[in-house]
Each structure stands twice: as structure tokens, then as C-alpha cells.
């Protein structure tokens, strides 16, 4: 069964938004890397002083392996992520009659 992972990364959202355009190729490579190690779905959202990440992964272990990459951690900081650890919520993905 897959898992949903929601991460709240505090940081500079203007810098992050700018990086989405200026470093689009790097974001695309990271997406391909995540798919290669068990990432199924991914979305970003921007709030007041934070970036929200909503992912679906094959397992929590796959997500943890992906996030442990030092190059990814450096990239997060470069695109506006605060040095403090993000808030992470993990839940088992379930199927429901109202799913769309």
C-alpha cells in the first residue's frame, strides 16, 4: 500500500517561486529521480512563509531514501528552504468511493 507524504517547508517563498522558473530543469531532474526510487505523485503549494509538498510514495522507506540525498538537501536550501527540518506527515493511502 502506498503512503501520502505532506511536508511543510518554512522558507523564502518568493525565492522558491523564482527558482521554479529559473531552475526548472533541475526541478524536472529531481522529479525523474523521485520516480526512479518510488515516487508516484507530487504537487507543490505555497502558503504564508512556507512551501507545502504533497506526495504519494510506494512506501515511507522510499521517501526517506530520496530525502536523505545530500544533494537534494543542498538544493532545498538553495531554492529558499529554511535550515530547520520540515514538518512531515505520513499516512497510508486508501481508496474511497468519493476519490477523484
Question: Language-model segments: which ranges?
Answer:
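Short S/T/G/P-rich N-terminal loop/turn motif that feeds into the first structured element of a domain
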Residues: 1-73, 82-100
